[in-house]
Design a protein with these regions (language model features):
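Membrane-proximal intracellular helices of multi-pass ion channels
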Residues: 1-450
Length: 450
């Protein structure tokens, strides 16, 4: 324990590395717990790679699995997974604050700056207060979600099992994890015609994907007009992509007999809505993903790339990044040198960061997809869908993970880890380096592009 504390709090180890080490340690300990015979219903030792894949997916709130969680793992094993989901869903920022509070250590200026940058807030004050608020809000919303879900689960499974199912799926939805313990290996397919279950899960996913900063702003301001620019943009973008996503899925899958082609119009809208919400971050599926058209898979990959808001339980390049890239494109097409959102000019360093994150996502996803497609002889579109799902911590699968080689399983583990931890810590390092060199100004040159 002393060795761990020395590594975590060593002065020469920056916050980004502490975060990475902390997440890796949590994943490893979780894997060892899931390997124990008590974690499986058959009381057998779970293979290390399968346990590691599951705990990485849970801690990184992804949802991809090699094992049917509900059918294979015991109550103890499911509880370990739920704990990891909650821990991963709260985010490294909250975990870091909690570690400092529990260890009675003061959060220094440098750590406050890094935490604030990662959270997307401009103020260094109230970081600890915000962490406490996150815990309170999370508990209240997850409890309300569990109560609503119990209306369906308790009558069907009995009180204790029904309440456990309600709690597990409420936490899994709010943390955007997408894990289910129904046990039939079909996620929410058996509830695809149930508006109560699907809408409850979708609302939990959407709220979880807004981010802690937006929640805090809504609670503090209590008025749309008083919200800051970031909160307004994120709320609008969240609604916009859900609506557009629903419409696109409805059109692309309307005549697909293997998905919603044979359903009524109302059921088609419900399924399209749920698919739109869950594809950007959660991983629950009310449709068999492998039965989607190739165009729907391509559209789903775009939604996975966008993800949720910064400081949220969601993955992807983040909503703010997507909005900024779109606004930058519009500004360039209009011949403007500045990007203006709600009467505010966006800093050029922020635009550079957004572009870097987008390019990084594209390079890693395409590179990983080509590798998996070649090694496992998979269709490229399916490989892209699976890798995007892993790197954006979504959890939707077209079956690539289940039939994957050892190399592909390890690669997906790495992608899930860096999708949850790496893309955030890289952004922190990127911002820090820019601030260290922004006092140096070199002569400009005209560089031919396009």
């Amino acid at each position: 324990m002393n060795i761990i504390r020395k590594i975590l709090f060593h002065k020469r180890i920056n916050t980004a590395r502490r975060i990475s080490f902390g997440f890796a340690l949590i994943i490893l300990v979780g894997a060892l717990l899931l390997m124990l015979p008590i974690s499986s219903k058959e009381r057998v030792v779970t293979p290390f790679l399968s346990a590691l894949f599951t705990t990485t997916s849970a801690t990184c709130v992804t949802g991809l699995t090699l094992i049917n969680v509900g059918a294979y793992f015991s109550l103890f094993g499911q509880a370990v997974i739920l704990f990891l989901i909650q821990l991963g869903g709260l985010g490294f920022m909250t975990i870091l604050c909690i570690v400092f509070i529990v260890s009675n250590r003061q959060i220094g200026l440098r750590n406050r700056m890094l935490i604030a940058q990662t959270m997307g807030t401009e103020s260094l004050e109230g970081i600890v207060k915000l962490a406490k608020h996150v815990l309170h809000i999370t508990g209240i919303i997850e409890l309300l979600g569990a109560i609503v879900l119990s209306i369906r689960f308790v009558p069907k499974y009995g009180f204790f099992k029904g309440m456990w199912f309600s709690i597990f799926h409420s936490v899994s939805a709010f943390c955007n994890a997408g894990f289910d313990i129904i046990g039939d290996g079909k996620s929410m397919l058996s509830y695809r015609h149930d508006p109560l279950v699907l809408c409850t899960l979708a609302i939990l996913v959407a709220i979880g994907g807004l981010g802690f900063i937006v929640w805090e702003d809504i609670i503090a301001k209590k008025s749309w007009k008083r919200l800051n620019v970031y909160s307004k943009v994120i709320i609008f973008a969240q609604i916009f992509f859900i609506v557009v996503g629903t419409f696109v899925y409805f059109i692309l899958e309307y005549g697909n007999i293997n998905t919603i082609g044979a359903e009524s119009v109302g059921q088609k809208i419900l399924a399209s809505f749920f698919q739109s919400v869950t594809t950007r971050t959660a991983g629950f599926d009310a449709l068999i993903q492998n039965n989607l058209t190739d165009l729907s898979k391509a559209w789903g990959t775009v939604l996975m790339m966008i993800g949720g808001a910064s400081g949220s339980t969601a993955g992807g390049v983040k909503l703010g990044t997507a909005v900024l890239v779109i606004m930058t494109l519009i500004s360039v097409l209009r011949g403007k040198s500045d990007v203006v959102i709600h009467g505010r000019r966006v800093a050029h360093t922020t635009i550079l960061q957004a572009m870097a994150l987008l390019v990084l996502w594209l390079v890693l996803v395409v590179g990983g997809s080509v590798l998996i497609s070649y090694i496992d002889n998979q269709d490229l579109i399916n490989s892209i869908y699976e890798v995007a799902s892993a790197y954006s911590t979504v959890g939707l699968s077209v079956g690539v993970s289940g039939s994957a080689s050892t190399f592909t399983k390890i690669l997906l583990i790495v992608y899930m880890f860096f999708g949850r931890v790496g893309i955030m810590t890289i952004s922190v390092v990127f911002m820090t380096r820019i601030r260290k060199t922004n006092d140096i100004r070199y002569p400009e040159c005209n560089f031919i592009v396009g």
